[in-house]
Swiss-Prot record:
Residues 1-25 are cytoplasmic. GO terms for biological process: nucleoside diphosphate catabolic process. Its main location: membrane. CDD domains: ASKHA_NBD_AtAPY1-like (cd24041). It comes from Oryza sativa subsp. japonica. This is Probable apyrase 2. GO terms for cellular component: membrane. The active site is at residue 192. ATP binds at residues 70-80, 216-226. Belongs to the GDA1/CD39 NTPase family. It is a single-pass type II membrane protein. The chain crosses the membrane at residues 26-46. Keywords: ATP-binding, Calcium, Hydrolase, Membrane, Nucleotide-binding, Signal-anchor, Transmembrane, Transmembrane helix. Its EC number is 3.6.1.5.
Length: 467
């Protein structure tokens, strides 16, 4: 029965909504109070990261919420495997207690130049390490790439292809990972340099910002050295055309909604180990070297070559060694472009993208071994002049004293510690035009998400294949 309220003058009117709410306010209070309390608790609870299924719905299916990538870095000084785990937004996730799996072994594939099958077998233990951390149900959809760098490039097309084919066969027969023939390849130098640039800027959170906010990267490997930094579009269009057989100077990248024009060049034969051969050849007329330490006798072997490396009767000389290094770098070679680094190569023009410079790989290793950076620190601020000071100290030593002074240096590298440090200083200052007192960041690992990630090109490759 519908209830009515009395109207003025004795008539009746229907109950209004306000009347009914007032009449049942007690019942409403009993119902709404618990609901309000539950809502408040949910609102105040700390937010946890998106669940696997929620993350998966944004990009991949539920089984793919955690996506893995296995990248082999087949360098001239050794082989390394990196395993990365990503979420649906392509952010790195931990693998156990670490942000990545990283395992390395020596020697590199190029040491098996005449035995491709043994070269492939040298990767088996690394492959097993990778399999252990990737869940069985995800292995079939986990890509595995092998990128060989300067060491294999130096062997020539025929020998390097024989080794690569043996590696492809190994992955097809022994691996449960997803693989394709073109995922096992010799990386060209610019691709290696571009991946390295992507890796470091990704880890620093620079991608998506203007080119002036990014950092430049110099990566000194064993067989080659790469310089990469972002330049303005107006400078990119002015880039000289490369000579026949050379790689383009500029790569166009689209990363996190931003277009970058990346100057990148790889200098083959100027990685630390390959440069030793070039320096010894530059001073070869004497029959000895001013760059090797007093007391050393013998030859230096690199690739398929042997180079006279016996020390001068008077021992090493910083200034005379530097002359040989400048000669090896061909600093005075004619420059047909606007600005050149060394060997007549265009240097990209400089600019804001090069001002904040990160230098990696052998730069960090030799600095740590020479004692002017903490070997356990992931990054360190240095100047090229630090390499100069360390070189002058090293060049004064004989072989025996150097072994005592540098306990962290492998015995095979002791005779070349003067040469290596002179080369690194000269490469930076005379080769790349870095000011002697310009501050740089030596980087081995980059802080990321309460962890440290190896500053190497494989992460850039993993980002590409997992995208």
């Amino acid at each position: 029965m519908r209830r009515y309220s009395a109207l003025p003058g004795g008539g009746a009117r229907p109950d209004t909504l306000a009347d009914r709410l007032h009449r049942y306010r007690g019942v409403l209070l009993v119902i709404l109070a618990p609901l309000a309390l539950v809502s408040l608790v949910l609102l105040l609870m700390p937010r946890s990261p998106a669940s696997s299924s929620a993350a998966a719905g944004r990009r991949w299916g539920p089984l793919d919420a955690n996506k893995y990538a296995v990248i082999f870095d087949a360098g001239s000084s050794g082989s390394r495997v990196h395993v990365f785990r990503f979420d649906a937004n392509l952010d790195l996730l931990h693998i156990g207690d670490q942000i990545e799996l990283f395992v390395q072994k020596k020697p590199g594939l190029s040491e098996y130049a005449n035995n491709p099958q043994e070269a492939a077998k040298s990767l088996v233990s690394l492959l097993e390490d990778a399999k252990r951390v990737v869940p069985v149900e995800l292995r079939g959809q986990t890509p595995v790439r092998v990128g060989a760098t300067a060491g294999l490039r130096a062997l020539g097309a025929e020998k390097s292809e024989e080794i690569l084919q043996a590696v492809r066969d190994l992955l097809r027969e022994k691996s449960s990972f997803k693989t394709q023939p073109d995922w096992v390849t010799v990386l060209d130098g610019p691709q290696e340099g571009a991946y390295e640039w992507v890796t470091i800027n990704y880890l620093l959170g620079k991608l998506g910002k203007t080119y002036a906010d990014t950092v430049g990267v110099v990566d000194l490997g064993g067989g080659s050295v790469q310089m990469a930094y972002a330049i303005a579009e107006k400078d990119a269009v002015k880039a000289p055309k490369p000579s026949e057989g050379e790689d383009s100077y500029v790569k166009k990248l689209f990363l996190k909604g931003t277009t970058y024009y990346l100057y990148v060049h790889s200098y083959l034969h100027y990685g630390l180990l390959a440069a030793r051969a070039e320096i010894l050849k530059a001073g070869n007329g004497k029959g000895y070297s001013y760059c090797t330490l007093e007391g050393h006798q013998g030859q230096y072997k690199y690739g398929n070559g042997k180079f006279e490396a016996s020390a001068s009767p008077s021992g090493a000389s910083y200034s005379k060694c530097r002359d040989d290094v400048v000669k090896a770098l061909k600093v005075d070679q004619a420059c047909t472009h606007m600005k050149c680094s060394f060997g007549g190569i265009w240097n990209g023009g400089g600019g804001a993208g090069q001002k904040n410079l990160f230098v990696a790989s052998f730069f960090f290793d030799r600095a740590a071994e020479a004692g002017f950076v903490n070997p356990k620190a992931p990054v360190a601020k240095v100047k090229p002049s630090d390499f100069e000071k360390a070189a002058k100290r090293a060049c004064k030593l004989n072989l025996k004293d150097a072994e005592a002074a540098y306990p962290g240096v492998q015995k095979d590298n002791i005779p070349y510690i003067c040469m290596d440090l002179v080369y690194q200083y000269t490469l930076l200052v005379d080769g790349f035009g870095v000011g002697s007192h310009q501050e740089m960041t030596l980087v081995k690992k980059v802080p990321y998400s309460n962890a440290f990630v190896e500053a190497a090109w494989p992460l850039g490759s993993a980002i590409e294949v997992a995208s």
